[in-house]
């Protein structure tokens, strides 16, 4: 646990399910004030809010579409109005869907880029604007992926969004480091989240994915949440501009694990 996270105001986009929910609950355990953004499932968001409160934190929910500038502005302003400030912005909302690249429509491409990359930029921009204007040494955490460095056939739009996020985060980190504002990525590997539930329920598909992970198991959302808590804390005060992978070693060329090559 990180005592300095108590009463910190943390905004999480896509915070009602999956990795976002796990992070919301972890910050609840840290006794933070959590702003849970959700897209359209209010019941799910209210359940997440209750879980955060039961964990020891405070929470509000804010509906919004991260691809819409006005919604992201409203999200940040609502957090500030409700809790008086902003300390940590976590841009977690994301989408993915497999399509052969030669069949990928422009609408599909735009949906993924707009959600994963533009949404993260808008969240980063609004948070940093507030930090700069109020001389706050704030913290931005962007949810990237192992696919910011590993090519992913059938997911060219997703891989492009995460590759773009890598350099966006590094650029923002460099630009605002003199003001004490830290910007980092988390790069999850394969995770036991609702979006993967059907796939991992199939023993064959699960074993295939596990074979690509040197540590041999699919990650738990709580393991990503632990990384987020670390990056948000003063224990990471000298850390900026990195991607911290929580991937069980997936990015470390697992095919070479047995000495092959």
Swiss-Prot record:
Active-site residues are 158
- Give the matching InterPro entries: NAD(P)-bd_dom_sf, Sc_DH/Rdtase_CS, SDR_fam
> What is its quaternary makeup?
Homotetramer.
Q: What is the lineage of its organism?
A: Bacteria, Bacillati, Bacillota, Bacilli, Bacillales
Q: Which family does it belong to?
A: Belongs to the short-chain dehydrogenases/reductases (SDR) family.
Q: What is this protein called?
A: Glucose 1-dehydrogenase 4
Q: Which gene encodes it?
A: gdhIV
Q: Which PANTHER family match?
A: OXIDOREDUCTASE, SHORT-CHAIN DEHYDROGENASE/REDUCTASE FAMILY (AFU_ORTHOLOGUE AFUA_5G02870), SHORT-CHAIN DEHYDROGENASE_REDUCTASE FAMILY PROTEIN
Q: What class of enzyme is it?
A: oxidoreductase
Binding positions for NAD(+) per the UniProt entry:
11-35
